[in-house]
Amino acid sequence: MARLKDVYLKTVAPALFKDFGFKSPMQVPRITKIVINIGLGEALQNPKAVEAAIGDLTMIAGQKPVVTRAKKSLAAFKLRQGMPIGAMVTLRNDRMYDFYDRLVNLALPRIRDFQGLSRKSFDGRGNYSIGIREQIIFPEIEYDKVDKIRGLEVAIVTTAPNDEQGFALLKALGMPFRD
């Protein structure tokens, strides 16, 4: 079992149950999945960019990503329907907890001038999104082998019905928020 899952089950879930006064243990918010996405605008000029991004995402997530393709053609961007424009991976269960643990304890502290994450990135339904500007903050990525610095988005999906409960869950699991 993942270390963070054990922490959640033994300390975080009972504390949230008590704090919010839930009637059933199934009401306690939990993380359901983490979606990591890399959008590749340069994939139109450089088809090898998709393969490089897939390699980076595989190293970061520990799981093979799926290539995302354009839904519609857009003449302004010289984009045709079905062209590869990104890569994404959905993590659940143990891989999700392992990634969250590495994100909070290893990757985020390596960001330059890191002051903590904003509380405003919740979506109103308890889900949290983080934009990361450089994939090299993850220890799995070797700086010398990176062809281009790319950003990525991390969406943390929870069962929390509102931002207050989502914030309490992520804060209890060690997310470094700005106060």
UniProtKB/Swiss-Prot annotation:
A matching Pfam family: Ribosomal_L5
Superkingdom of this protein's organism: Bacteria
Example GO biological process: translation
UniProt GO MF annotations: rRNA binding; structural constituent of ribosome; tRNA binding
Transmembrane segments: none
Swiss-Prot/TrEMBL keywords: Ribonucleoprotein, Ribosomal protein, RNA-binding, rRNA-binding, tRNA-binding
Assembly behavior: Part of the 50S ribosomal subunit; part of the 5S rRNA/L5/L18/L25 subcomplex. Contacts the 5S rRNA and the P site tRNA. Forms a bridge to the 30S subunit in the 70S ribosome.
Protein family membership: Belongs to the universal ribosomal protein uL5 family.
Role summary: This is one of the proteins that bind and probably mediate the attachment of the 5S RNA into the large ribosomal subunit, where it forms part of the central protuberance. In the 70S ribosome it contacts protein S13 of the 30S subunit (bridge B1b), connecting the 2 subunits; this bridge is implicated in subunit movement. Contacts the P site tRNA; the 5S rRNA and some of its associated proteins might help stabilize positioning of ribosome-bound tRNAs.
Protein name: Large ribosomal subunit protein uL5
Lineage summary: Bacteria, Bacillati, Chloroflexota, Chloroflexia, Herpetosiphonales
Gene that this polypeptide is encoded by: rplE
